[in-house]
């Protein structure tokens, strides 16, 4: 394989990663819309679409294997590029799984009228959505500052999760009639927090791609 063909295949790999990222991002957007509208049909569509994300991951990983097999020797920078792609794709697939978890929780709400605390969950969802978008932008732009900035925002998501979690437990202790709804809200918040962690992982991979240094910013 010539260098020119290798670089073209590598660029196509990145394009497929971004297509996968866009779909995973939309899954989260749709989750929050389904929660707001109490739309069980939309939640079901989210669940079914996860198979597409899984297939995209497998296809990208297969292309990575073929690329490594056909391009020898591989220089360190190229290997880092490929390794980063695999790591990010893995986190995007997990992100899609968490979208499914949220969609399933939405279906279990059974159309109950929302408690006012749902507004706090929408706020948390908006923060996570912006993190996903900006993490992918940081990867595309090779923007080190943006990658670190997105990681810092995960601390806000973690703090919000803890506060909402405690509020939900307090409300449950006072109003037993809302236990099912509030329990599902707990699940939604838990998975939003995990999505924030996955997004931080994407930024860590971008930092590694740019600097060659592995960092752990998910503490």
From Swiss-Prot:
GO biological process terms, semicolon-separated: intracellular phosphate ion homeostasis; negative regulation of phosphate metabolic process; negative regulation of phosphate transmembrane transport; phosphate ion transport; regulation of phosphate metabolic process
Gene name of this polypeptide: phoU
GO molecular function: protein homodimerization activity
Domain of life: Bacteria
Family according to the record: Belongs to the PhoU family.
Upper classification of the organism: Bacteria, Bacillati, Bacillota, Clostridia, Eubacteriales
Cytoplasm among keywords: yes
Signal peptide from the UniProt entry: none
Keyword Acyltransferase set for record: no
Location, primary (coarse class): cytoplasm
GO cellular component terms attached to this protein's record: cytoplasm
InterPro entries for this protein: P_transport_PhoU (IPR028366), PhoU-like_sf (IPR038078), PhoU_dom (IPR026022)
Protein name: Phosphate-specific transport system accessory protein PhoU homolog
Physiological role: Plays a role in the regulation of phosphate uptake. Encoded together with proteins of the phosphate-specific transport (Pst) system in the polycistronic pstSCAB-phoU operon.
Keywords associated with the record: Cytoplasm, Phosphate transport, Transport
Pfam families assigned to the protein according to its UniProt record, in alphabetical order: PhoU
Assembly: Homodimer.
């Amino acid at each position: 394989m010539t260098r020119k063909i290798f670089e073209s295949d590598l660029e196509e790999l990145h394009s497929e990663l971004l297509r996968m990222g866009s779909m995973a991002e939309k899954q989260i957007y749709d989750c929050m819309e389904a929660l707001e509208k109490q739309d069980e049909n939309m939640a079901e569509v989210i669940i079914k679409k996860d198979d597409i994300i899984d297939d995209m991951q497998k296809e990208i990983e297969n292309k990575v294997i073929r690329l490594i097999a056909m391009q020898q020797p591989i220089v360190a920078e190229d290997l880092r590029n490929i390794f980063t792609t695999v790591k990010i794709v893995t986190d995007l697939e997990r992100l899609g799984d968490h979208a499914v978890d949220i969609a399933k929780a939405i279906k279990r709400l059974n159309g109950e009228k929302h408690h006012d605390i749902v507004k706090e969950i929408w706020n948390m969802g908006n923060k996570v959505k912006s993190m996903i978008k900006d993490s992918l932008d940081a990867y595309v732009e090779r923007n080190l500052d943006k990658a670190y900035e997105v990681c810092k925002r995960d601390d806000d998501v973690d703090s919000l999760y803890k506060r909402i979690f405690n509020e939900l437990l307090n409300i449950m202790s006072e109003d037993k009639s809302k236990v099912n709804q509030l329990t599902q809200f707990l699940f939604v918040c838990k998975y939003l927090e995990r999505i924030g962690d996955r997004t931080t992982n994407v930024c860590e991979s971008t930092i590694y791609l740019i600097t060659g240094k592995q960092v752990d910013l998910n503490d």
